[in-house]
Structure formats: C-alpha cells, structure tokens
C-alpha cells in the first residue's frame, strides 16, 4: 500500500464523507505545481476554487505570514491590532468603498452581507419589520451555512436541513422579466454571482449586470455582488462586475483575498450600509486578525503588482480559443471569462477529470457535466500549452 493510499484510508475512516475528492494526496506545492507523497508532479488547474490565484506558496505572501507570526497572531476584536487599519484602507481603496467588515470564510461574509441588507431594509429603506426579501438566482452557490442553503435552488443542498429560512425569492439567472416580476416593496437586495461558478461557469448575458444596477437604483434595492470566486482577477478583470462597467452597493470577497495561505473574507460597502451595525450587533473572534491582515495585504499587493487580472484576461482568451478548437462529440460548449473556463459535456465530466489526473493535470467537475478550469493566475503560456496537450489527449 502506498503512502497516499494509507492517507486516503485514514481520512475516509475518521472523516465525515461530505466530499468526494479525486484519489490524490497533495503533500507539496509551489506555483502551479503540486506533488503527492510518492513524488509524482501534477499541474493544479483548480486553484482551490480560486483561493490560490497568486499561486501556491507565493514567496511574498509566505514571507508576510512568517514575519507576522513572529510578532502577534490573534488579539480578537476586543483590542486594536497594528495592521488592521492598514488592511482596511487598502481593501476599501481597492474596491472604492467607505468601509470593510472582515470575516474568515466566504459563507460567513455572505451571512454578514445578508444581515446588513436586512437591517438596512428596516433602518434605512423603511420596510415593515420581518418583511424584507432578498432575490437570488437559480444555480447560485453562496456557501453551506443556513442562509445560503435556504436560498439555494439545489434540492440536495437543502435535503434534511429544514425548516429553511424565509425571505428569499429565486429567479432564473439572466432572465430580466423574471427579475422584474420578483421585485416588490419589500425587496431589500439582489444577491448575484457575476459569473456562476458551481453552476458550471455560467456567464450572464451582456448587459445583465447593468440591468440589475438600474433596477436597484430605480427601486432603492441593494446590489450585492458575491465576488468570492470570480473576483480578484479570476475573470480577467479585478472584479467580475467590471465586465458590465457597474459597481455594486456591496462586494463580498474571500478565497484569493488570503493568497491561498490564510482564510479571510470581507464585506465592503459605503457608510449607509455598514453603519447599520452597532457594537455587539455582529462580530467574529478571528475576523481581521493580525495574521490574516498581514497575509491579505501581501495577497492584494501581488494581485496588483503582478497584474494578475491582465494576465488572466490575456491567457484566458488564448486558453478558451484553443479549447474551442477541440472537436469531440461529447463537448457541448466551452465558456467563461479570463482563466475561469468550463467545458460543458453531454455526459458526466467526472471520468474526464479522472483521466486528466492520470495525465498529471488536476481539475474538478462541477454541476456533474462541466469540467472547470481555474489555474493559478501566475501560470505561463508554456504551462497552459502543456495543459492543452493533456486535455486534447483525453478527448482524442
């Protein structure tokens, strides 16, 4: 029995079976490359669902982690820390927003944004207490906690977790008429992924996000953009909403905000929204801790200094155009933006992901029939060409 097999057996014995990972153990990583305990090398084309946009163990981010770990790692929000304000300033200026509220995981940030939207609805918009509604979209994925589960359109995500939370409406992604029909006097917010990731890399029709912006302005509704996976350069723009030249009222960021090193997420909005929170109304023991702040400052600097959005745009266009040249009866469509690309198949994508793993390329199926490609944004054209050869071989 190999070391990898021993580790997988141990994991399966003691761990809850809420994931079905590919049968590979990763023990080392650098840049776009990972290794298993046996020394086999693989190209990472998933980036931990976009958490590793800057590449595995980016030296600037690792150095920031080490330097901060030698000073102080956690004080809780009961006290001030010396780098939280610096991080606030950097992330607020990046997004063009007045304030930031830090959390740890993406799901926590989504919950925070929903709480902010509801309290804003009552305190600012004047909706009758306990009547606020939030509109989301079929195919959405905003996390695994109760609010995101309640607004999901996937039955399996909800099975056995009732009673679900009230106050959510769902419409078809990209359908303007359904969206307009769902709006009423109690609508507090529209929550949208600018590109739906888990649903299969679904890109909205051109101008759809602009329509959402216009409807929100017309009806005094908050436009909340969940940019956890598509943001911070993944789509070829700093924010995926930039494709429609719109600015949401609320950004939700996570994943790459921690540089693949430490979990940190944030809700960004102007004073009118985040000032609804008063002392004791929301919080997080670890949110905005010194270690996370230091890592995130470095992670943001890498995104900007290395122009990762620009790299994603240029290389993504090349990668997508080459994928579209592959002719195979199983391929239904190739779609995406930047280095956030899906190949939709007429059959299950899992066998293709397993075949690619045997070829030394790691990716993951999503929505059963879509192969998702989201490599670290530091990938080179030469490395993409290597990936293309492997992808072509499994469709030969």
Curated annotation (Swiss-Prot):
GO CC annotations on file: cytoplasm
Assigned EC number: 2.6.1.13
Pathway(s) where this gene product acts: Amino-acid biosynthesis; L-proline biosynthesis; L-glutamate 5-semialdehyde from L-ornithine: step 1/1
The protein's required cofactors: pyridoxal 5'-phosphate
Catalytic activity: a 2-oxocarboxylate + L-ornithine = L-glutamate 5-semialdehyde + an L-alpha-amino acid
Modified residues (N6-(pyridoxal phosphate)lysine): 255
Alphabetized InterPro entries for the sequence: Aminotrans_3 (IPR005814), Aminotrans_3_PPA_site (IPR049704), Class-III_PLP-dep_AT (IPR050103), Orn_aminotrans (IPR010164), Ornith_aminotrans_bact (IPR034757), PyrdxlP-dep_Trfase (IPR015424), PyrdxlP-dep_Trfase_major (IPR015421), PyrdxlP-dep_Trfase_small (IPR015422)
GO terms (BP aspect): L-proline biosynthetic process
Primary role: Catalyzes the interconversion of ornithine to glutamate semialdehyde.
Family: Belongs to the class-III pyridoxal-phosphate-dependent aminotransferase family. OAT subfamily.
Name this protein carries in UniProt: Ornithine aminotransferase
Source organism of this protein record: Staphylococcus epidermidis (strain ATCC 35984 / DSM 28319 / BCRC 17069 / CCUG 31568 / BM 3577 / RP62A)
Lineage of the organism: Bacteria, Bacillati, Bacillota, Bacilli, Bacillales
Gene: rocD
């Amino acid at each position: 029995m190999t070391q990898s097999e021993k580790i997988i057996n141990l994991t399966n014995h003691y761990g809850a079976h809420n994931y079905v990972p590919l049968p590979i153990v990763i023990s080392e990583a650098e840049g776009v490359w990972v290794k298993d305990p046996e020394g086999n090398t693989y190209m990472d084309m998933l980036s931990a669902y976009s958490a590793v946009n800057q590449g595995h163990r980016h030296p600037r981010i690792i150095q920031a982690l080490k330097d901060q770990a030698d000073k102080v790692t956690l004080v809780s929000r009961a006290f001030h820390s010396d780098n939280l304000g610096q991080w606030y300033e950097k992330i607020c200026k990046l997004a063009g927003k007045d304030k930031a509220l830090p959390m740890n995981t993406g799901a926590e940030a989504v919950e925070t944004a929903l709480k902010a939207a509801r309290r804003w609805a009552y305190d600012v918009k004047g909706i009758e207490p306990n009547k606020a509604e939030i509109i989301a979209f079929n195919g959405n994925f905003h996390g695994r906690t109760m609010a995101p589960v309640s607004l999901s359109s996937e039955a399996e995500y909800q099975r056995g977790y009732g009673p679900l939370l009230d106050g959510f409406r769902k419409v078809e992604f990209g359908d303007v008429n359904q969206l307009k029909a769902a709006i009423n006097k109690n609508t507090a917010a529209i929550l949208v992924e600018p590109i739906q990731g888990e649903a299969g890399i679904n890109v909205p029709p051109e101008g759809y996000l602009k329509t959402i912006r216009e409807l929100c302005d017309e009806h005094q509704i908050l436009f909340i953009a969940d940019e956890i996976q598509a943001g911070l350069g993944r789509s070829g723009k700093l924010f995926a909403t930039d494709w429609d030249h719109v600015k949401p009222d609320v950004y939700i960021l996570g994943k790459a905000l921690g540089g693949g090193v430490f979990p940190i997420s944030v809700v960004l909005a102007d004073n009118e929204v985040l000032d609804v929170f008063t002392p004791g109304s929301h919080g997080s023991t670890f949110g905005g801790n010194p270690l996370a702040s230091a890592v995130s400052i470095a992670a943001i600097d890498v995104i900007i200094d290395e122009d990762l959005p620009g790299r994603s745009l240029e290389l993504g266009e090349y990668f997508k155009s080459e994928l579209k040249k592959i002719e195979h009866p199983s391929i239904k469509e190739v779609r995406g933006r930047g280095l956030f690309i899906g190949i939709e198949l007429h059959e299950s994508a899992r066998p293709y992901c397993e075949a690619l793993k045997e070829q030394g390329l790691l990716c993951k199926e999503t929505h059963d029939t879509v192969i998702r490609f989201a490599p670290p944004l530091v990938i080179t054209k030469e490395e993409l060409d290597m990936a293309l050869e492997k992808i072509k071989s499994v469709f030969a």
